[in-house]
Amino acid sequence: GFYNFFFFGELALDGTIKDTSHIFAIVLSLAKKGELKKVVTSLESAKKLGNIPNIDVYIVNTLNNAIEFIKSKEKDNYLYEKEEIKYEVLNLKDEQYFYNKKYDEDFKDVIGQDMAKYAALICAAGNHNFLMEGSPGCGKSMIAKRLQYILTPMNLGEILEKAKLQALDFKDVDFSPIRAFRNPHHSSTKSSIFGGGSSNAKMGEVALSNNGVLFFDELPHFPSNILEALREPLEDNKILISRVNSKILYETKFIFVSAMNPCPCGNKLSSMKECRCSDFEVQRYKNRLSEPF
């Protein structure tokens, strides 16, 4: 029957059917629940939807095409031919994991800091949170930015989930098996980090870093209310964003990586420069991080 076809697209004034940022997220969520099997949409949308397993995608690029599709008895003529994700594959326990051998940034660029690199390796292997303390310019940020490239390969479900978050964030969907890396500035607002909005609930950096890395540089400079609010997504691996028109629960299974100077001037651990801070100033600086955090 015809009742099991779902149509998605934005209709332009000239009759063409266009992609929108929310189509991929909607179809992926419905497909996971088993609530749809056949999708009719534009070619632009089909290129993304074709990566979702267990659904058939049909292409109609104009309103006239859609009418012809409805009338046609040969609907397979409109079927989109799916392409496999073109990355290296690791088969492990009857499941495929994808990884990319091409890195934008590599640990070989970090000179020295063998102990910090070893700690990063342990962090990546066990999904542990990671705090680096050191003088300015010693390589803390370099190590953090390279961490995403040594994390475990991604399965198809994780790749699709990352693509969904990219789409909802109005970014290009790339389906690359490189885990997310989010790096908010310490001057960022609470709503931009945790999500919010005036009426509709929007994602923040915490939700966008799911299955990846959330990096806070200059950790003590973040407001205490943001650091304390971070404890919930760290402990529960989820965050609820409530607004007037919606309530949305997002997964927050990220590795929290942070970096800080050892004192306000930054020179306490330096062998080249002298620290100008008193013991009281150093203690007050470190007291910005609570014991539970």
Segments from the language model and where they lie:
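Peripheral, non-AAA+ core regions of ATP-driven protein-machinery
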Residues: G1-L131, S135-C138
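A short beta-strand-to-loop transition that corresponds to the Sensor-1 phosphate-sensing loop
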Residues: L43, D217-L219, V244-N245, S258-C263, ...
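Conserved alpha-helical scaffold flanking the Walker A/P-loop in AAA+ ATPase domains
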Residues: L121, A180, S191-L214, K247
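Walker A/P-loop
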Residues: A125, F130-K171, D236
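AAA+/P-loop NTPase substrate/partner-engagement loops
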Residues: I150-S192, K247-I248
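AAA+/SF3 P-loop NTPase mechanochemical coupling elements
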Residues: R182, E205-N211, S242-N261, L289-F293
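Conserved AAA+/SF3 P-loop NTPase catalytic/coupling segment centered on the Walker-B
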Residues: H185-T189, A201-E235, G266-S270, S290-F293
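Substrate-gripping "pore-loop 1 plus following alpha2 helix"
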Residues: S198-A201, E228-Y250, L269-L289
